[in-house]
């Protein structure tokens, strides 16, 4: 199933297949079915949850981890839906709920542990606000590592491109974040633990132990 799903998600006309055959996809991932036709009732969205998902998958480059992330990034929205006094829909906490559901789905499909962890991490981070500053980007880089941080920017861009046209300017902020990241890396600052001149063994030799090692490195 996983091999065929990867072919579908990374193949041509993926969006059309997702939209036309949601019932078939639901046989293998039934958690997606409640999203079909579910109105988001929010000015930022011009599509129901499932249609937004299909457009978001199509908006990101065809790499399995990225495509799976977009397929499952909002799968917990139905379970977190609320409406405020103005009639606007909200989905508070949906990244965490979606991440938990995605973890179960990916395990059921027998994905590799590393791929599963990356997908869940990206889903849990996809709605976080990352300040467009060196400190904000540095903090995210420290938590995610460069590869997943760059993936996260792609996820955020694709998510935004699948929203209402008048709110797609957010993608410009993602472009600016990528440029700032490249500038920071060109200056070769220490943005990740692996970039440090010391490691856990060095601190161990100096008498540090347990959690103290990780906290000191950070």
Where are the regions that the model predicts?
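Alpha-helical scaffolding flanking metal-ion-dependent phosphate/phosphodiester catalytic sites
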Residues: 63-66, 71-78, 137-185
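Charged substrate- and nucleic-acid-binding regions of tRNA-handling and nucleotidyl-transfer enzymes
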Residues: 104-108, 161-218
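A glycine-rich phosphate-binding loop feature that marks nucleotide/adenosyl-phosphate handling sites
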Residues: 23, 35-38, 74, 118-126, ...
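Histidine/acidic-rich helix-loop-helix segments that form or flank divalent-metal centers
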Residues: 40-58, 111-168
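Non-catalytic alpha-helical coupling and interface elements of nucleotide-dependent molecular machines
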Residues: 10, 26, 80, 128, ...
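Short glycine-/small-residue-rich flexible loop motifs, especially phosphate/cofactor-binding loops
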Residues: 18-19, 103, 120, 152, ...
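Histidine-centered, transition-metal-coordinating active-site segments
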Residues: 10, 14, 95, 112-113, ...
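Glycine- and charge-enriched loop/helix tracts that form the active or gating conduit
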Residues: 1-71, 75-93, 97-111, 204, ...
């Amino acid at each position: 199933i996983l091999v065929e799903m990867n072919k579908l998600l990374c193949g041509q006309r993926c969006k059309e297949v997702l939209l036309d055959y949601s019932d078939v996809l639901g046989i293998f991932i039934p958690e997606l079915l409640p999203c079909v036709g579910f109105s988001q009732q929010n000015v930022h969205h011009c599509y129901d949850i499932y249609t937004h998902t299909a457009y978001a998958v199509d908006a990101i480059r065809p790499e399995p981890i990225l495509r799976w992330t977009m397929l499952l990034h909002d799968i917990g929205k139905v379970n977190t839906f609320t409406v405020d006094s103005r009639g606007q829909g909200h989905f508070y906490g949906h990244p965490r709920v979606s991440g938990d559901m995605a973890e179960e789905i990916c395990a059921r499909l027998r994905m590799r542990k590393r791929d599963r962890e990356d997908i869940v991490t990206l889903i849990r981070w996809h709605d976080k606000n990352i300040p467009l500053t060196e400190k904000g980007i540095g903090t995210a880089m420290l938590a995610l590592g460069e590869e997943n941080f760059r993936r996260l920017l792609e996820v955020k861009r694709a998510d935004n491109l699948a929203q209402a046209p008048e709110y797609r300017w957010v993608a410009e902020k993602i472009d600016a974040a990528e440029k700032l990241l490249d500038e920071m890396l060109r200056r070769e600052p220490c943005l990740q633990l692996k970039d440090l001149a010391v490691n856990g063994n060095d601190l161990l030799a100096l008498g540090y132990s347990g959690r103290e090692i990780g906290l000191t490195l950070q």
